[in-house]
Regions:
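Flexible loop and strand-edge segments within Gram-negative outer membrane beta-barrel domains
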Residues: 290-339, 347-381
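Periplasm-facing N-terminal accessory domains of Gram-negative outer-membrane beta-barrel systems
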Residues: 1-93
Length: 404
């Protein structure tokens, strides 16, 4: 007698993990199948894909700060799910167990850290201004330069050796007020990842570190606004649905007001000041479960000026800042194949202007007026198109490809 045993068929379970209230996608949410002992995480767009054997499965969906959700089902075909997790602020019994010593060595994300947004907002900071980069400075292997500045020295590297990404697009200058603040407004940020080593191939090469910042998509259910007043800056944010469950927007603005008070303590013939502002805006539209569109905008600027006026006139201004416009299209070709196409424009400008006028009285009573105007300009303009593909053939394997 001969016994023939056929292997079980495998099917793919894919979908998105969302916040139950705002319908924001959750980046890095965990999906674990208790029966087969395999799992995966959501990508930067909240999408997951996992291939499992045919039959009954019991999935745990979890994310920090949210209640664990269990889903049991019989998998007999490729299935797409949208999972909504609920906030859980209750602290149950906590059992602290130490990891095995080799856990960090065997991890595929060795050298990577995720910084929770509540941790950033609650970290004590200079002038009570919460800052993303200053929170990163508290991590092991990261140091700051001058006290109070936001520069990152990661494992001996310099600040110019770091790659800063905002929604996947590089920023060439991330400092405000000579490094006292960064351009990342905490209220507009959704996820922050720091890579100190073992950089994922999708980022290309970098000498020191990669700081990957993702911004909020906007609430698809309810309108919500907030106003924050600080010692250096004030922040205003408003978000809500344009078409409930399909289209949302978010607008976030921050500005300093040093320039409003500094002239009050200066001599009458002198004026000077400093100001900064950041504007973040995003439009998010879901065409279907397979197609989503994101349009992001960022503009930030620092402005320093000084002028005096008596018999002579002098004026000098320094301006620098970033402008970023980013359009991203997500498409699910198959349950195992996910793509993201990005069209991005990025501009960085640094300008110094000087204007000077002087008058010389001649013996014959005539006046000679000399004037000069100087402009020192430098900048970078980037226009890029890229497509990334993620293929998940097996739970423990992921294949990616990018076209730039």
């Amino acid at each position: 007698k001969y016994a023939l045993q056929s292997s079980k068929k495998s099917f793919t379970l894919n979908g998105y993990v969302l916040d139950s209230i705002s319908k924001e996608t959750l980046i890095g949410a965990n999906i674990y199948d208790q029966k087969n002992g395999v799992g995966t995480t959501t990508n930067p767009f909240g999408y997951f894909s996992i291939t499992l054997p045919e039959g009954g499965i019991k999935l745990n969906f979890s994310y920090i700060g949210y209640a664990v959700k269990q889903v049991s089902l019989h998998l007999w075909k490729d299935t797409m799910l949208t999972i909504q997790l609920h906030n859980d602020n209750q602290l149950n019994e906590v059992i602290i167990l130490s990891d095995k010593p080799e856990t960090g060595i065997q991890s595929s994300r060795m050298g990577a850290s995720s910084i929770p947004i509540p941790h950033i907002k609650n970290t004590p900071a200079l002038m009570s201004e919460a800052d993303v980069l200053k929170s990163i400075q508290l991590l092991p292997g990261v140091q700051n330069g001058m006290n109070g500045t936001s520069g990152l020295y990661v494992r001996g590297g310099g600040p110019d050796q770091n790659l800063y990404l905002l929604d996947g697009v590089p920023l060439y200058n991330v400092d405000h007020t000579l490094g006292l603040l960064s351009v990342f407004t905490p209220e507009a940020v959704k996820k922050v990842d720091l890579y100190k080593s073992s950089f994922p191939a999708r980022f290309g090469g970098r000498l020191s570190s990669i700081v990957d910042v993702r911004t909020n998509d906007g609430n698809m259910q309810h309108y919500h606004g907030s106003l924050t007043i600080g010692l250096l800056t004030s922040h205003l944010q408003f978000e809500g649905p344009i078409w409930k469950d399909h289209t949302s927007f978010i607008i976030s603005a921050r500005r300093s007001y040093i320039d409003c008070f500094l002239p009050l303590v200066m001599p009458k013939d002198e004026r000077g000041g400093y100001s900064l502002y950041d504007i973040n805006a995003k439009l998010n539209h879901r065409f279907s479960e397979q197609d989503r569109l994101f349009i992001s905008f960022y503009k930030g600027k620092d402005h320093v000026y000084y002028k005096y006026k008596d018999e002579d006139k002098f004026k000098q201004t320094h301006d620098w800042g970033n402008i970023l416009l980013n359009t991203r299209w997500n498409h699910v070709f198959t349950p195992q194949l996910f793509s993201n196409t990005t069209l991005a424009y990025n501009r960085y400008v640094f300008d110094i202007r000087q204007e000077e006028t002087s008058s010389i009285q001649q013996p014959d009573g005539s006046t000679i007026i000399n004037g000069s105007h100087n402009l020192f300009h430098s900048g970078i303009n980037d226009l890029s198109v890229s497509t990334d593909f993620d293929y998940h053939p097996l739970p423990a394997h992921k294949i990616g490809r990018a076209h730039v």
